[in-house]
UniProtKB/Swiss-Prot annotation:
GO biological process per UniProt: cell differentiation
Protein name: Turripeptide Ici9.2
Function: Acts as a neurotoxin by inhibiting an ion channel. May also act as a serine protease inhibitor, since it possess the kazal serine protease inhibitor signature.
Organism domain of life: Eukaryota
SS bonds (residue pairs): C26-C56, C30-C49, C38-C70
Tissue occurrence: Expressed by the venom duct.
PANTHER family: FOLLISTATIN, ISOFORM A-RELATED, FOLLISTATIN-RELATED
Residue runs in coiled coils: none
GO MF, any single term: ion channel regulator activity
Signal peptide: 1-20
UniProt cross-references to InterPro entries, sorted A to Z: Kazal_dom, Kazal_dom_sf, Prot_inh_Kazal-m, Prot_Inhib_GrowthFact_Antg
Gene Ontology terms: cellular component: extracellular region
Amino acid sequence: MKVYCLLLVLLVGLVSQAQGQLDKKCQTMCTMEYLPVCGSDGTTYPNKCTLTSTACVNQMDITVLHNGEC
């Protein structure tokens, strides 16, 4: 029983560490500057940083179609 508990704790730790590494590579701190861009997913983002951050965190390939709202 102790072995199973130890394995469970190790597994949870590994999953948490992997999630933390994913979050660290994504830039999530963006300015509040409003320079809207239209994303390839049809969404208007407040600025390019927000688009890039959203794409990274959600592991999606979103690009800027054009400056301004969609």
